[in-house]
Amino acid sequence: MNTMTNDLSGVVAADRAHVWHHLSQHKQYETMDPRVIVEGKGLRVWDAKGKEYIDAVSGAVWTVNVGYGRESIAKAVADQLVKMNYFAGSNGTVPGALFAEKLITKMPGLSRVYYSNSGSEANEKVYKIVRQISHRHHGGMKNKILYRERDYHGTTIGT
């Protein structure tokens, strides 16, 4: 880890004043500073005070499934961001089509992928897809959804 020599008190103050932390009770920040993570490598992260943590959350639930500091991935992403960072899913893109083709080889019996920006969006889209299938094949009579109670499905109202 690179030791941070900069004074991060301004960052901590800005965080405390302006950031709503996901899945957190903010009362605690009245008497203590929020933890500010400044660096990651592999499955480890370091906070502003230099304390090391094993990140057991981001890869399992959020977006860091391959760990931090993966230079080859960062370079590929940077190259694509310069070329074209995003275009609406209502149109095709070169990386989207090529990745879908590759992904389908790992999903026997399926022929299409749907890209979404989050797990919440994916869950809500699959609900709409299932409703459409039910309407087409069962006259709309099948309308129950199975889910695991008290499990994480996303942060939107629908999920």
Task: Describe the residue ranges of each PLM region.
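Tryptophan-centric aromatic hotspots in well-structured domains and transmembrane helices
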Residues: 18-20, 62, 86, 144, ...
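Conserved beta-strand and immediately adjacent loop positions that scaffold enzyme active sites
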Residues: 42-44, 112, 144
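Conserved PLP-anchoring active-site segment centered on the Schiff-base-forming lysine
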Residues: 133-153
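Active-site-adjacent loop/helix segments that line or gate small-molecule/cofactor pockets in enzymes
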Residues: 2-41
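Active-site and channel-lining beta-strand-loop segments
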Residues: 34-56
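Glycine-rich loop-to-alpha-helix module at the N-terminal edge of alpha/beta enzyme cores
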Residues: 5-8, 52-139
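Fold-independent oxyanion-binding glycine-rich loops
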Residues: 48, 118, 148-150
